[in-house]
């Protein structure tokens, strides 16, 4: 488990750097892909609130750039992360 978290942390660091570079270069498709990857990493970590924000950003940028596949991928992940967040909150309230 500790190794998995360490790998996720490293991956997050690399993707955040990729996002910075994409922003500097104004590479919008790179930005949307980075937001999608960050959302997936944060979902795995259980940070559903932040992951849904990243998926939303990925969706919006993909829409602007005409990347329909990435937009749909981000939309599905947004829905799954949102449902997981609601389920986690529901279970916490019960317990």
Tell what function each PLM region has:
Residues 39-44, 78-94:
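Alpha-helical linker/edge segments of TPR/alpha-solenoid repeat scaffolds
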Residues 6, 21-29, 45, 61-69:
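Short coil/turn linkers that connect adjacent helices within long alpha-helical scaffolds
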Residues 13, 33, 53, 73-75:
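Residue register of alpha-helical TPR repeats
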Residues 1-8, 16-21:
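Extended alpha-helical assembly domains of large eukaryotic scaffold proteins
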Residues 9-12, 29, 49, 89:
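Residue register within tetratricopeptide repeats
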Residues 11-18, 51, 57-58:
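Tetratricopeptide repeat
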Residues 2-5, 35, 42, 82:
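Residue at a conserved register position within TPR or TPR-like alpha-solenoid repeats
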């Amino acid at each position: 488990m500790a190794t998995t978290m360490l790998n996720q942390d490293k991956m997050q660091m690399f993707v955040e750097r990729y996002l910075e570079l994409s922003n500097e270069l104004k590479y919008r498709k790179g930005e949307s892909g980075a937001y999608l990857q960050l959302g997936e990493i944060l979902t795995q970590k259980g940070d559903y609130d932040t992951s849904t924000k990243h998926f939303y950003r990925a969706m919006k940028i993909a829409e602007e750039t005409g990347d329909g596949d990435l937009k749909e991928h981000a939309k599905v992940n947004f829905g799954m992360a949102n449902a997981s967040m609601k389920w986690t909150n529901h279970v916490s309230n019960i317990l």
